[in-house]
């Protein structure tokens, strides 16, 4: 059974007290310290469990299934051991999940918008990534980013986030591996058909960046990660642009597209 990316990490937390970080990009390389300025680490007392994307100084976008009590967000992080001087930590002030989301369907509208308790400042390692101006095209070059396990089964945690290059695939290429996916889920399929590069458990909520734009949110995938014919599934950000812009503008009663 395919698993929501964060659930695999929660199981690991139960099995091993020492390994508390989230899982992440399989088949990647160490990210450059300056290439993930919009990446947000979402964490609690057990460690990182999800990621998010800073879209302006006061708002973060992540997956709805990352919602949890008592979490914080870290901005400008790279190494877990060596702090950047410009790292900043914020709490959520308000959280918005689509009011028309089906609560018993984890794949439906897997997106959450978070207002910070205070704005963050742009710095050498912190900068927002704006919402996409147009939908992505099949075949686009995409980048995935995250902290955690760099192996799909035996957990191996790196100190810094890893990155990998993948491609946006046609939905028809994903359908055989995910017969449960429905068009109304508003998702993107991205990865390598032959496998080997993928996001993984705990990478949930992090960005899929295609041609320099924030197009997807890590949501769903096969387990183990990186299987052939089971690319990653990402919430399609563009379809929720109007909802997010309405919330940010103050219309907190706005609903998501059906």
From Swiss-Prot:
Its activity is inhibited by PMSF and p-nitrophenyl-p-guanidinobenzoate (NPGB). Negative results: does not degrade the gamma-chain of fibrinogen, does not activate plasminogen and does not possess fibrinogen-clotting activity. Expressed by the venom gland. Residues 1-18 form the signal peptide. Residues 25-249 form the Peptidase S1 domain. The active site is at 65 (charge relay system), 110 (charge relay system), 204 (charge relay system). It holds the Pfam family Trypsin. Glycans are attached at residue 44. Gene3D superfamilies: Trypsin-like serine proteases. Keywords: Disulfide bond, Fibrinogenolytic toxin, Glycoprotein, Hemostasis impairing toxin, Hydrolase, Protease, Secreted, Serine protease, Signal, Toxin, Zymogen. PROSITE patterns: TRYPSIN_DOM, TRYPSIN_HIS, TRYPSIN_SER. GO terms for cellular component: extracellular region; secretory granule. It is an enzyme of class 3 (hydrolase). Monomer. GO terms for biological process: proteolysis. Snake venom serine protease that degrades preferentially beta-chain of fibrinogen (FGB). This is Beta-fibrinogenase stejnefibrase-2. GO terms for molecular function: serine-type endopeptidase activity; toxin activity. It comes from Trimeresurus stejnegeri (Chinese green tree viper). The keyword Disulfide bond applies.
